[in-house]
Amino acid sequence: MGSNTSKVGAGAEKQQVYTPLTQIDFSQSLVSQLDSSKESDYVTKQNAEKFIEKKVSQRLSNLEVETLKKFEDTLNNSLLSDDDKDAVDGISSSSLNNQIESLNKKLTLFDQLELQKLEKYGGAKGKSDKKTDNGSISIKAKLTECLLANKGKPLNCYEEMEEFKKLVMG
């Protein structure tokens, strides 16, 4: 389709000359300078590409600096302040840390109370030992042995697991 129009035959090359309406005179020095110029089209093209690459890299570096600045500003604005005075709605990182510490203290106290209750009623102490009063192996030990015996295989410890659940729940 378009290939016939874009091909030029060997003998069909024509040189067209346009004559301007006004007379253009170039000085002899300009013509000799253009003739003696060592830059070819290839060199000119390479220089133009280098210039464009330089401008693009400058623009990219400017954009990178602007983007990083915007990101840092956004990040700094989104972080909670350390001071209680600057905090918005009473929330600051120091107040949140204090709340977390108080909750951790309450949890440890709760865990200690639960352990004391279990020890008081004999639930955890008597049943977690290796052997119970009648000499049979404890449920925890049975479950541990079953898990170790079936290491890397599908587990067949359903009964031991159910007994352990009963022990823990109750």
Swiss-Prot record:
One biological process term in Gene Ontology: cristae formation
Keyword Mitochondrion applies: yes
Domain of life, per lineage: Eukaryota
Pfam families for this protein: DUF1690
InterPro entries: DUF1690
Keywords: Membrane, Mitochondrion, Mitochondrion inner membrane
Keyword field contains Mitochondrion: yes
Disruption-associated phenotype: Increases frequency of mitochondrial genome loss. Partially altered shape of the mitochondrial network with condensed, fragmented mitochondria accumulating at the periphery of cells. 20-40% of mitochondria exhibit an increased inner membrane surface and stacks of lamellar cristae disconnected from the inner boundary membrane.
One GO CC term, this protein: mitochondrion
Membrane topology: Peripheral membrane protein
Entry's localization field: Mitochondrion inner membrane
Subunit structure: Component of the mitochondrial contact site and cristae organizing system (MICOS) complex, composed of at least MIC10, MIC12, MIC19, MIC26, MIC27 and MIC60. This complex was also known under the names MINOS or MitOS complex.
Membership in a protein family: Belongs to the MICOS complex subunit Mic19 family.
Other known facts: Present with 3550 molecules/cell in log phase SD medium.
Annotated function: Component of the MICOS complex, a large protein complex of the mitochondrial inner membrane that plays crucial roles in the maintenance of crista junctions, inner membrane architecture, and formation of contact sites to the outer membrane.
Name the UniProt record assigns to this protein: MICOS complex subunit MIC19
Gene name of the record: MIC19
